[in-house]
Amino acid sequence: MIDLHTHTNGSDGEKTPEELIDLAISKKITALAITDHDTVDSIEKAVKYAKSKDILLIPGIEVEAQIKKGQMHILGLFVDYKNKELRKKLKYIKKARDSRNLKFIEEFNKLGFNITLDELKEVSEGKIIGKPHFAKIFLRKKYIKEKDEIFQNYFEKTPFKEIPKTIYGPEEVIKTLKEANAIVILAHPQSLKLENEELKEKIKELKKYGLDGLECYHSKQTKKQMEDFKNIAQEYGLIITKGSDYHGPNTKPGIELGTGKKNNIVLEESEEKDMVNKLLEISKNRYV
């Protein structure tokens, strides 16, 4: 079994890199990509820890690209996490994210809540602050009963949804990841909120920038979406990947490492091996 889209507490996941790797091994996962949001700070620790383990650890990252409709997240697999230009861009993204978080705090406090930056830093343990950290505070203060309430009632509505986090468009994100030798994958394509024909046009555009693949198996996809995305990937000569988008049982309840939601991303062993072999072949050629 494999999982090519996961998060640690380096961003908004719950487990340390070591804990995530141990969990993967306990589930007989043979290839694991760590793809934290907008940061590669956990990768070095993960790579060192995995060296003595029976698992292929794939250095990765997930970066959001600025678009007008929906959300576009782009994965970089086998990324050179020491690349100077990548790290420079990630610093700019962190500043934009910090600015967004301050605006979130301001808007929440206007509504009568009491949220501080110090609280966010505490629950994030000094790592990248994301929306799940706001949810933790809201749960702690009993402003909400379930984590999803903060997304449904606030983050997905005005003015919160209009507050931008990212500063780079798809072309710049893909270019930066390619320069860091990453294999570039469009994560959970359903987040773009496009019909199949519109999605095809968008993929044609992204392919011109250097897109390598499509995440065709994701925990939040229906069977039909998986089939549609797989067909689109094959039509445009893109590699196919699978990822649970695992964060942990409290952050994303019901999503399991390697198997997704109710085993919805469990595939034949041969198909998963083929995915990894293709990634290894591309990665080998890029680093030669």
Task: Set out the residue ranges of the language-model regions.
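Extended substrate/RNA-proximal surfaces in nucleic-acid metabolism proteins
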Residues: 51-204, 263-288
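Conserved, well-ordered active-site substructure
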Residues: 253-267
